[in-house]
């Protein structure tokens, strides 16, 4: 497949993700928990993931704080029942999106994926957590605190993984986020029991040019004030 075709396919996928139907009406707002950490979470009541239904279940989130830059991000997911090889999930913010799950264990020569049932996992970026195993090839993942790398595959048959959680560090977290889950194959429905999204963020660095301009403006202001005072002190 050519690089141009690949890019077009990724763009089409991103557009499809942006148009996903929301499955819940509530808006989940990130809360500051101290030390630059912000968390949004949901723990039920349990939500069935519609079986073999691409509309899935979507959660709308909002990050109200401004002037920040993401340094780390993690997603915890708790799912029971079903067939893990059917599951698909993504996290999106603006034009950026990460594919969290894409039919774990499914390959071109085995499209059913892993038959294991239920997931209790922590997904993290590989750039900030070295040595993570790829969740797509992990049949029986350990529960947190063990972390795994998000799937990242646009198609479950891909070998490249451009859409992992590594797309988010250095981005501005402010604004709307979407967390989406779907079951892409018939039989063996899964139940979503909870999730949490944790973001670590720091203040945006001051632009050196703006800082220099501000310093010059302050200096000029002080000089002018001194000149005015001298005028009033003249006999």
Model regions and ranges:
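Sec/Tat signal peptide C-region and signal peptidase I cleavage site
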Residues: 21-25
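C-terminal membrane-anchoring or membrane-association module
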Residues: 219-235
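Bacterial N-terminal signal peptides that target proteins for export
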Residues: 2-11
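Loop and turn regions of beta-sandwich accessory domains that flank beta-strands and are enriched
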Residues: 26-201
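A short, hydrophobic C-terminal helix/tail in secreted or cell-surface proteins
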Residues: 204-224
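Bacterial N-terminal signal peptides
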Residues: 10-19, 215-216
């Amino acid at each position: 497949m050519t690089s141009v075709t690949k890019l077009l396919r990724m763009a089409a996928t991103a557009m499809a993700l942006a148009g996903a139907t929301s499955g819940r009406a509530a808006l989940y707002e990130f809360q500051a928990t101290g030390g630059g950490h912000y968390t949004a979470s949901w723990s039920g009541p349990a939500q069935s993931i519609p079986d073999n239904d691409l509309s899935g279940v979507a959660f709308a989130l909002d990050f109200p704080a401004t002037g920040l830059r993401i340094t780390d991000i993690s997603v915890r997911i708790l799912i029971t029942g079903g067939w893990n090889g059917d599951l698909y999930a993504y996290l999106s913010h603006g034009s950026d999106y990460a594919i969290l799950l894409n039919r774990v264990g499914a390959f071109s020569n085995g499209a059913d994926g892993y038959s294991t049932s239920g997931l209790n996992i922590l997904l993290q970026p590989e750039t900030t957590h070295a040595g993570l195993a790829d969740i797509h090839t992990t049949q029986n993942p350990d529960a947190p605190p063990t972390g795994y790398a998000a799937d990242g595959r646009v198609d479950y048959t891909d070998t490249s993984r451009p859409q992992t959680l590594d797309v988010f560090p250095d981005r501005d977290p402010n604004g709307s986020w979407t967390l989406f889950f779907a079951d892409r194959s018939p039989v063996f429905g899964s139940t979503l029991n909870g999730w949490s999204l944790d973001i670590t963020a720091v203040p945006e660095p001051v632009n050196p040019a703006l800082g220099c301009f501000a310093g010059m403006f302050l200096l000029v202001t002080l000089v002018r004030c001194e000149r005015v005072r001298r005028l009033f002190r003249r006999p």
